[in-house]
Amino acid sequence: LEKIEFIIPCYNNKYQLKNILYSLLNQSNPNWTAHVISDGEWVEYDDFKIDFERENLFEDKIKFSLIKGPNKDWGHTARNYGLEHATQDWVVMTGSDNYYMPDFVSEFLKNTTNNNFIFCNMVHNEAHYKHYQELKAELTVNNIDMSCFATKKENAQQLRLNKKSYQADWEFVEKYITLFPGGIKHINKILYVHN
């Protein structure tokens, strides 16, 4: 069975990190793993990791790593590290401030046949919005978020995120679909929330 690996950079945000991990633990399909990469040491990281492991909530689904940092590059160094060490068939490079609907993994894995890039719609919440806003994802600049798509691991590992660019999401997508055309599937459902 195919699995999705969530690559989750984090730094100094244990409450948000708990939210994304619980959203994964509540997936209706168990065929996923997560790799949490701390972008440098922070005061509560070790305690958070120990407490989470002690609770034994994840049954070997969640791995923790610490890299030298903070790199202050929107998590791109940590995502590149996670990508280099990915072990599952599919990867989702996300952020610790996000969370997923319970059927995200199920919907994505139903659509893997003959596809190598799968993406869904999302809800977006930023400080300047007064409310959550639905965004129908499109393969154009400013209309797709790193966390709403999954790619075949072996293809994604041939690319890297631009550490200096705020638009690394789109730059990655543009390179990916240019190098690996075809096999693109849009799931016209909201399965992801960017907080």
List each language-model region with its residue ranges:
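Conserved donor NDP-sugar-binding/catalytic core segment of glycosyltransferases
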Residues: 105-131
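Acidic donor-binding segment of Leloir-type glycosyltransferases
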Residues: 25-68
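Cell-envelope/extracellular polymer assembly enzymes that use nucleotide-activated donors
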Residues: 3-5, 23, 33, 171
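Conserved nucleotide-sugar donor-binding catalytic segment
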Residues: 137-195
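Short aromatic/hydrophobic "clamp" motif used to bind/position activated sugar donors
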Residues: 91
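Glycine-rich, basic loop-to-helix element that forms the pyrophosphate-binding segment
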Residues: 69-86
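Short, well-formed alpha-helical segments that are part of the catalytic scaffolds
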Residues: 13-26
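The conserved acidic donor/metal-binding loop of glycosyltransferases
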Residues: 95-99
